[in-house]
Curated annotation (Swiss-Prot):
This is Nucleoprotein. GO terms for cellular component: host cell endoplasmic reticulum-Golgi intermediate compartment; host cell Golgi apparatus; ribonucleoprotein complex; viral nucleocapsid. Its main location: virion. Residues 193-223 have a biased composition (Low complexity). SUPFAM superfamilies: Coronavirus RNA-binding domain, Nucleocapsid protein dimerization domain. The gene is N. Homooligomer. Both monomeric and oligomeric forms interact with RNA. Interacts with protein M. Interacts with NSP3; this interaction serves to tether the genome to the newly translated replicase-transcriptase complex at a very early stage of infection.
C-alpha cells in the first residue's frame, strides 16, 4: 500500500482547498474550471518539466511534497545531522522517512545599476525513489543532492510514496521533529512553492517573507513547532543586505568626507553632549588641556572615547541622578562671546558643579583604573615641560661619540700676528724707522 503525505491511510480522498489542517495550497495551482478572482493579477503558468527559465537557473521537473528551504547567507553548507532532515508528514510512517534534498538554482535578476545578480539556491525534499533522482541509490555522491533518512528507515529500498499531483495534492509546510538542527544560513520557505514563478523579484521576495511569517504563525497555533526555525527578523535583515551586496559583519570604511561629516555632527551638539573619538578629538571638542581641563594625555587625547582604556573609566562616571542630587550646583550668568555684534545678544548661563566620585580597592579593575588615572591626570604639565626643554644638540654625521666638549667648536684658519694683537719688544730697525718718521719733511732739490 502506497502512502500519501498529509493524508491518513484510512482516507485517501482529496477535500480540495482545506484550511486549518496544516496544508497550504501552491500559489500557482489555480483551478481553471472555477471562477477564481485574481485581484487584478495575471494568472501564472503552471511549472512543468518542459518549462524554461529566461534568466538562467535549472527547472524543477517534479513537485515536492513540502515547501523549500532557502539559503540567505553565502558560503553556508546545506547539511543535517545523521538521522535528521526528513520533514514531518501526517500519514507517513517512520520506516518510509527517507529521501534527499535537491538543490534548485534559481534565476538571476538585473539590479538597478544594470548588473546581473544570481539568487541564492533553494532546496526541496523528495522521498527515496521519487523526484529528479528517483533512479539513484541512497548515498550516491551527486552534486546538489543531500541524502537524509530516519533511524527506522531502510535506505536499501525505495520509499512507498506516491508522486505529488499538483492538481489534486496540496503542498505541506516543512516542519521537523523536535531536536532537529536547521542548517545555518537557511530558513524554511513558508509560501509553499516548489517552483519559481515569473513575477518580479521584489514582489516575490516580499510575498515570500509575509507568507512565511503567516504560515509559521498558523503552524504554531495548530501544533507545537520544533523550534528549528531561526529568528525571521535576523534572516530578513541578512537577506536584504545580501541583495544589496553589503556584508553585515564587514566594518564600514571611513573616508575623509565621512570623518568630516562625523566631526561636524559632533561639534553641532551642545558642549556637554559631545563624545570625542577618532574623527573629533578631545581638543576639538573641549579645547586644550589646562588647569580647568586637566584630564587626558597621549593616545587618549587622539582617540577620545574610542581609546581601549576609556570603557573602564566610564564605570566611574556618575549617572544623571548622581550628577544633580550628589553634587554642589551653582547657576551663574556669563558673558556671551559668540555671535556678531549686529545680532541680538542671548543670555548665557553656566551650571557649575562640584562633586566627588568615591571608590576603594575592592572595585573591579582597581589597579587598571589607578594606572589610567595616573597617566592622564595633569598629563598636560608633563607635555608642556617637555616642550619648554632646550633641544638636545644633535651630533653631526660622521662624528664619533666621546669626543668631549670641543665636538661642536668650529675650526677656523689661524690668525695673523696683527689679528692676534699680541705685544712684542721693538727691534733696532723698528726704532730707526720711528726716528725717521719724527723728522720734518724736506723737499729734495738736488739735480741729477
Amino acid at each position: 500500500m502506497s502512502f500519501t503525505p498529509g493524508k491518513q491511510s484510512s482516507s485517501r480522498a482529496s477535500f480540495g482547498n482545506r484550511s486549518g489542517n496544516g496544508i497550504l495550497k501552491w500559489a500557482d495551482q489555480s483551478d481553471q474550471s472555477r471562477n477564481v478572482q485574481t485581484r487584478g493579477r495575471r494568472a501564472q503558468p503552471k511549472q512543468t518539466a518542459t518549462s524554461q527559465l529566461p534568466s538562467g537557473g535549472n527547472v524543477v521537473p517534479y513537485y515536492s511534497w513540502f515547501s523549500g528551504i532557502t539559503q540567505f547567507q553565502k558560503g553556508k553548507e546545506f547539511e543535517f545531522a545523521e538521522g535528521q532532515g526528513v520533514p514531518i508528514a501526517p500519514g507517513v510512517p517512520a520506516t518510509e522517512a527517507k529521501g534527499y534534498w535537491y538543490r534548485h538554482n534559481r534565476r538571476s535578476f538585473k539590479t538597478a545599476d544594470g548588473n546581473q545578480r544570481q539568487l541564492l539556491p533553494r532546496w526541496y525534499f523528495y522521498y527515496l525513489g521519487t523526484g529528479p533522482h528517483a533512479k539513484d541509490q541512497y548515498g550516491t555522491d551527486i552534486d546538489g543532492v543531500f541524502w537524509v533518512a530516519s533511524n527506522q528507515a531502510d535506505v536499501n529500498t525505495p520509499a512507498d510514496i506516491l508522486d505529488r499531483d499538483p492538481s489534486s495534492d496540496e503542498a505541506i509546510p516543512t516542519r521537523f521533529p523536535p531536536g532537529t538542527v536547521l542548517p545555518q544560513g537557511y530558513y524554511i520557505e513558508g509560501s509553499g512553492r516548489s517552483a519559481p514563478n515569473s513575477r518580479s523579484t521584489s514582489r516575490a521576495s516580499s510575498r515570500a517573507s509575509s507568507a512565511g511569517s503567516r504560515s509559521r504563525a498558523n503552524s504554531g497555533n495548530r501544533t507545537p513547532t520544533s523550534g528549528v526555525t531561526p529568528d525571521m527578523a535576523d534572516q530578513i535583515a541578512s537577506l536584504v543586505l545580501a541583495k544589496l551586496g553589503k556584508d553585515a559583519t564587514k566594518p564600514q570604511q571611513v573616508t575623509k568626507q565621512t570623518a568630516k561629516e562625523i566631526r561636524q555632527k559632533i561639534l553641532n551638539k551642545p558642549r556637554q553632549k559631545r563624545s570625542p573619538n577618532k574623527q573629533c578629538t578631545v581638543q576639538q571638542c573641549f579645547g586644550k588641556r589646562g588647569p580647568n581641563q586637566n584630564f587626558g594625555g597621549g593616545e587618549m587625547l587622539k582617540l577620545g572615547t574610542s581609546d581601549p582604556q576609556f570603557p573602564i573609566l566610564a564605570e566611574l562616571a556618575p549617572t544623571a541622578g548622581a550628577f544633580f542630587f550628589g553634587s554642589r550646583l551653582e547657576l551663574a550668568k556669563v558673558q556671551n562671546l559668540s555671535g556678531n555684534l549686529d545680532e541680538p545678544q542671548k543670555d548665557v548661563y553656566e551650571l557649575r558643579y562640584n562633586g566627588a566620585i568615591r571608590f576603594d580597592s575592592t572595585l573591579s579593575g582597581f589597579e587598571t583604573i589607578m594606572k589610567v588615572l595616573n597617566e592622564n591626570l595633569n598629563a598636560y604639565q608633563q607635555q608642556d615641560g617637555m616642550m619648554n626643554m632646550s633641544p638636545k644638540p644633535q651630533r653631526q654625521r660622521g662624528q664619533k661619540n666621546g669626543q668631549g666638549e670641543n665636538d661642536n667648536i668650529s675650526v677656523a684658519a689661524p690668525k695673523s700676528r696683527v689679528q692676534q694683537n699680541k705685544s712684542r719688544e721693538l727691534t733696532a730697525e723698528d726704532i730707526s724707522l720711528l726716528k725717521k718718521m719724527d723728522e720734518p719733511y724736506t723737499e729734495d732739490t738736488s739735480e741729477i
